A protein has these predicted regions:
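A hydrophobic, multi-pass inner-membrane permease signature
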Residues: 138-146
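An internal, D/E-rich "acidic patch" concept
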Residues: 57-113
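Alpha-helical transmembrane segments of integral membrane proteins
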Residues: 2-4, 16, 88-127, 143, ...
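Hydrophobic alpha-helical segments of polytopic membrane proteins
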Residues: 6-8, 13, 150
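Short hydrophobic, aromatic-rich alpha-helical segments embedded in or entering the lipid bilayer
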Residues: 42-75, 172-173, 204, 253-264, ...
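Residue-level recognition of pore/gate-forming positions within transmembrane alpha-helices
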Residues: 12, 43, 136, 152, ...
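Hydrophobic alpha-helical transmembrane segments of membrane transport/permease proteins
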Residues: 15-65, 155-174
Length: 311
C-alpha cells in the first residue's frame, strides 16, 4: 500500500510540475510584463531596468531552471505588482475562497447525494424525471450563466441579496449557492448511475429474495458499493475547489484566489500565477490521495489488491 501511494504521489508531482512548466513558458511568451505593468508610455530605460531586475532579460531556459532551483529552496518568487512574496499575496486570499467553497461543498453533498439515491430508487417515475431534469440543467448550464440568473433574480428583481462584493456574509450567499448547485447536479447524476448499477447486481436480488427489508438492502448493500464510484467524482470536486471558483468569483466580484488568478494573468504577475497553479495542483493531488485511502476503507477488497500489487 505504501509503495502504491508513493507511486501515486510521484505521478501527481510530475503532473503538477508539467502544469507549472507549461504555464511558465506560456506566460513568458504571451506578453511582456514590463509593458503591461509599467505601461507603454514608460521610457526604454525603465523597461530595461524592470526586465533586468526580474531576470526577464535572460533566455527563457535560464529563467526556467533558476525558477525551479528557487522553488526547491522554498522561494516561490515575489509579485511584480507590489514586490511582496507571491505566497503571501495568495495566502491572503485563501480564507475568502474557503469561505464560499467549503459551504458550497456542503451544499453539493447535502443535495447531490440524496437526490441521486432517490432518483435511482424511484427510477422511471416522476421523481426520477424531475431530479434528472434539474440535474441536466445544472450540469449543462455554465456556472457564470447560473450566477448571472441568480443575481438577476435575488439581487436585481427581489433585492434580497447583494450582487457583488465581500463586505458582509450576505455577499457570500450567491457565489456559494451557485457553486453548490452546479456541483450538486454533477454528484446527483453520478450517484444515480452508481446506484442503478449496484441495484442491478445479483447479490442485491439475492438479499431481497432472502426476505430482508428493502431499506436494509439499500442501506447495508447498495449504498456502500455505490459509494466507491461516487467517491471519485466527489474527490474531483474537492480537488477542483480553487479552480472552480475562478468563474464564480469573477461574476460576483468576490476577492478570492480565483479572481486573483484572473487579475494576475491579465497583469502578467508571473510568480502569483505560478503559486496559484501550484496550489491547484497540490489540492488535486491531496484530494486524489484521500480518495484512494477512502477506497480501501469503504471496500477492503481494493486495499487487499493494492497490498498484493505493492508486495
Amino acid at each position: 500500500m505504501v509503495q502504491y501511494l508513493l507511486m501515486k504521489i510521484f505521478r501527481a508531482l510530475v503532473t503538477v510540475t508539467l502544469i507549472v512548466s507549461a504555464a511558465f513558458v506560456v506566460l513568458r511568451l504571451s506578453g511582456d510584463p514590463a509593458i503591461i505593468i509599467l505601461g507603454p508610455e514608460a521610457p526604454p530605460e525603465a523597461f530595461e531596468a524592470f526586465r533586468r531586475n526580474w531576470g526577464l532579460d535572460e533566455p527563457i531556459w535560464v529563467q526556467y531552471f533558476k525558477y525551479f532551483a528557487a522553488v526547491f529552496q522554498g522561494d516561490l518568487g515575489n509579485s511584480m505588482r507590489d514586490g511582496r512574496s507571491a505566497l503571501v499575496v495568495v495566502g491572503e486570499r485563501i480564507p475568502l475562497t474557503l469561505a464560499i467553497t467549503l459551504p458550497a461543498l456542503f451544499i453539493k453533498l447535502a443535495i447531490g447525494l440524496p437526490a441521486g439515491v432517490m432518483a435511482a430508487l424511484y427510477r422511471n417515475t416522476w421523481v426520477d424525471r424531475l431530479i434528472m431534469m434539474l440535474s441536466v440543467a445544472g450540469f449543462t448550464v455554465p456556472s457564470f450563466v447560473l450566477g448571472l440568473v441568480l443575481a438577476m433574480i435575488f439581487a436585481v428583481w427581489l433585492g434580497w441579496l447583494p450582487s457583488g462584493g465581500s463586505d458582509t456574509w450576505a455577499h457570500a450567499v450567491l457565489p456559494t449557492v451557485t457553486m453548490g448547485l452546479v456541483g450538486a447536479a454533477v454528484i446527483a447524476r453520478f450517484t444515480r448511475s452508481a446506484m442503478l448499477e449496484v441495484l442491478g447486481q445479483p447479490y442485491i436480488r439475492t438479499a431481497s429474495a432472502k426476505g430482508l427489508l428493502w431499506r436494509d438492502v439499500v442501506r447495508n448493500h447498495a449504498l456502500p458499493n455505490a459509494a466507491i464510484p461516487t467517491l471519485t467524482i466527489i474527490g474531483f470536486l474537492v480537488g477542483s475547489l480553487v479552480a472552480g471558483a475562478v468563474v464564480v468569483e469573477s461574476v460576483f466580484s468576490w476577492p478570492g484566489v480565483g479572481r486573483l488568478l484572473v487579475n494576475a494573468v491579465a497583469n502578467r504577475d508571473l510568480a502569483v500565477v505560478q503559486v496559484i497553479l501550484l496550489l491547484v495542483g497540490l489540492t488535486m493531488v491531496g484530494a486524489n490521495l484521500a480518495v484512494d485511502i477512502l477506497y480501501g476503507i469503504v471496500d477492503p477488497r481494493l486495499r487487499i489488491k493494492r497490498l498484493q500489487a505493492g508486495s
